[in-house]
Regions:
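Non-catalytic signal-transmission and effector/linker regions of two-component phosphorelay proteins
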Residues: 1-19
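Polar low-complexity intrinsically disordered regions enriched in Ser/Thr and small residues
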Residues: 8-10, 45, 81
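Short, structurally constrained coil/turn elements
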Residues: 14, 39-42, 85-87
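Short active-site oxyanion
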Residues: 18-19, 44-46, 88-91
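Generic detector of well-ordered alpha-helical packing
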Residues: 25-26, 71
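CheY-like receiver
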Residues: 52-58, 62-132
Length: 132
């Protein structure tokens, strides 16, 4: 595990067809999603960030296939931050608030996952991203 600006950046050596980062201000949500992705052999988590400023720096220096992005965060919402994500990266919104679903699709998100996450729904979202 490496540290960049106080944020954990995970490096897994397993083979994966896709990498991802997780951006969420809630530590338990980040840990839960990372753990679930490992369990289902999902994309390799290469970064986990509690704030968009660290994530923006990481995205400017690394190629990221998929971004799991929380909507309600301090300083900037996920709906605002999506504009700063490179167009080559796909976005799956993660939130406890269903009222943002329509807006997220209008911003070209691949999918929209409600917390708490469940494996079946997560697998469907990843399948959509892999076949996008």
């Amino acid at each position: 595990m490496y540290f960049i600006d106080g944020e954990s950046v995970y490096r897994y050596l397993k083979n994966s067809d896709m990498n991802c980062i997780i951006i969420d201000d809630e530590p338990l949500a980040r840990e839960e999603l990372s753990s679930m992705l490992q369990e289902i052999s999902g994309p390799t988590v290469i970064g986990s960030f509690s704030n968009v400023l660290y994530a923006e720096k990481f995205l400017s220096e690394n190629e990221v296939d998929l971004v799991f992005l929380d909507i309600q965060m301090p300083k900037m919402t996920g709906l605002q931050f999506i504009e700063k994500i490179p167009k080559s990266s796909m976005v799956i919104f993660t939130t406890a608030y269903p009222q943002y679903a329509l807006e997220s699709y209008e911003l070209d998100a691949i999918d929209y996952l409600l917390k708490p996450f469940n494996n079946e729904r997560l697998q469907k979202a990843i399948h959509k991203a892999r076949h996008y």
